[in-house]
């Protein structure tokens, strides 16, 4: 059996074999392609009416993909270019929505714990200490999956937002090895009141998902959860901690609360901006109807 190209630790986790296998567990077909020793994973998505499209999460676009897309009757190829140079000679259109956060917050954790604490906003340090004084206990184990899902339901109902189906999280936790995907929980008086999913990938730890019980918001468990994950990431050899999506523009945007929370962990770090998602049209008719449907949805 031919060995697949090794995906560098500098490649985003969304291009890892673990993520590809998880996507297959959710029912999606995936493809692997290589060129000049570089491997990419492609995920096939299906939509009502307009059919299928390819998505390359945080990966490079290969010209050879166009032939594969035509063979598989794909409407368009979506990808997240690293910079403008990478799309300079491609016929692309901006996607109607971004598949991944366009702005992320990543801190350098090669520093000592003392320095990391000193670079936090005073309120963040205070809340970490408060959670410790309140007796919050942090644990990490996939045995807490039901507690995590309970908190996800509570958070979705409270904020009026749509999370992934429960089966999505179960398959993620079951498929991705526990040494890579860690489920952290915060317990208060023997009750799980907050939980996070964190990926340890190469030199980077990535905060994927979090959920809380708002009844216990005053004990500041989410702050201690993040701090424990940062310390564990340091001890495992990670050099960066990726808090995921933020939105630093717009005063009253829906991201303001979570952005303020994340940015509090470093006053010396600036967020990283990406170009967002772009599409290469394979079937103009399918893509035309797709954009019409998207416009109708945005109005409703």
Feature locations, PLM:
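A conserved beta-strand-loop-helix scaffold within acyl/acetyltransferase catalytic domains
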Residues: 1-50, 84, 92-218
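A structural signal for short, well-ordered beta-strand segments and their strand-loop junctions
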Residues: 75-80, 137-141, 185, 240-242
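Active-site/acyl-donor-binding loops of N-acyltransferases
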Residues: 4-8, 46-48, 90-114, 239-300
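Non-catalytic accessory segments adjacent to catalytic cores
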Residues: 61-103
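Aromatic (often tryptophan-rich) hydrophobic motifs at membrane interfaces
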Residues: 67-68, 174, 180-287
